[in-house]
């Protein structure tokens, strides 16, 4: 409105045959607003200012990445087992080797963004600044089943939520002097990641020294705290006891 007040909004519905029927479709809205402050009367006549815009947005994006096309296929495996007291009494049976979570649905990345655009001195000085909070809910993760389930496969399930927060900025200076021109930029980002929750009270997910645990970054490196390194044989002998 009046080149000062800006708003955009979208809604989309996506479908993926990778999900079971009940979770196949997801609806993902997004909205963005902006305020071109430099168009206000109290800033419009400031000669050195070219742009000053405050903007904010919130949107939801769905993801089915990492899901195999055959996720809904149940696999049956043939195994041999001894029944009774006679070790030679071997019976062949069929077991369900792949357990499926028929409640699978879309991951949802919900992001809030607050930003500022600034240009001055005939567009030579520029600044772009963003603060964001991105929460990913219903994260698809493989879970380990107990051995009594008979399954050797770790099925996918929507069990976790994680959050990323941080800032991004880009400061630039552009100069033209006849046939000579140059651009200078200073770019910076920060990122803080942590697991917000895991459903079903599951234990931490371990992959070697990398552990995913509520309250800590995804796949954080865990290990013993080191007090020091032995420098010579004498120190080893003195601390052997």
Language-model region placement:
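Short, intrinsically disordered, charge-balanced linker/junction segments flanking boundaries
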Residues: 3, 236-241
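Extracellular/periplasmic, surface-exposed regions of secreted and cell-surface proteins
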Residues: 1-225
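Aromatic-residue-lined binding/catalytic grooves and analogous aromatic/hydrophobic interfacial grooves
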Residues: 171, 231-232
């Amino acid at each position: 409105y009046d080149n000062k007040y800006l708003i955009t909004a979208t809604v989309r519905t996506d479908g993926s045959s990778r999900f079971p029927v009940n979770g196949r479709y997801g609806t993902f809205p997004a909205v963005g607003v902006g305020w071109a402050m430099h168009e206000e009367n109290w800033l419009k006549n400031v000669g050195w200012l070219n742009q000053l815009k405050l903007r904010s947005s919130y949107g939801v994006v769905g993801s089915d990445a990492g899901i195999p096309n055959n996720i809904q296929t149940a696999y049956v495996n043939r195994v041999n087992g001894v029944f009774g007291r006679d070790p030679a009494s071997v019976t062949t049976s069929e077991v369900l080797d792949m357990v499926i979570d028929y409640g699978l649905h879309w991951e949802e990345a919900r992001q809030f963004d607050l930003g500022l655009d600034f240009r001055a001195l005939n567009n030579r000085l520029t600044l772009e600044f963003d603060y964001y909070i991105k929460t990913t809910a219903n994260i698809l993760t493989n879970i380990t089943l107990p051995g009594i389930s008979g399954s050797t496969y770790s099925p996918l399930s929507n069990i976790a939520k994680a959050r990323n927060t941080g800032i991004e900025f880009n400061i630039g200076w552009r100069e033209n002097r006849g046939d000579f021109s140059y651009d200078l930029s200073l770019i910076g980002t920060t990122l803080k990641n942590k697991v917000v929750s895991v459903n079903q009270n599951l234990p931490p997910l371990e992959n070697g020294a990398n552990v995913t645990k509520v309250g800590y970054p995804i796949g954080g490196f865990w290990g013993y705290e080191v007090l020091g390194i032995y420098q010579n044989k004498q120190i080893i002998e003195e601390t052997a006891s």
